[in-house]
Amino acid sequence: MAKAASANPCEGEILRAAERYKIPAGILYAVGLTETGNKGSLQPNALNIGGKPVFAKSRAEAIQLAEQADRDGVKLVDLGCMQINRRYHGNKFESLSAMLDPAKNVDYAARFLQQLHAQHMTWSMAVARYHAGPDNDPAQKRYVCRVIANLVATGFGQWTPNARQFCGG
């Protein structure tokens, strides 16, 4: 990630936010890869519109796509490096452009993940809740297993017997 961090604004911000909020960098990076990983790197202009990933070529295009989704009545739109959900978190940003700004997007995601960790006391539960609310156990389990797989694939962790059993592998 160090080499890629210099070229990818999301990855550089992940390193800064991990240090700022005392989050293991590998966990924050694996969450980002799970959210917007495309060809092995995080995407600052990524969106998820109604469950469909979209990789815009620019912030301007991403804004246009998000605005069109609003006009079309799409309720769930996730934006940026860490796929911040506009419906549930958009009021924490001054604009769509701010939500897509890698520094603001990653900082908010890291702060949110740290709050979840303080509430649930484990990184596994914090990661689970990052993706899905408390009443969606199947989605949480799938998500945590995808994050663990990315953590292992990037060299930040390894499969433990408990993780293998939990994820069914």
Predicted features, each with a name:
Residues 3-169:
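Catalytic glycan-binding domains that act on GlcNAc-containing polysaccharides
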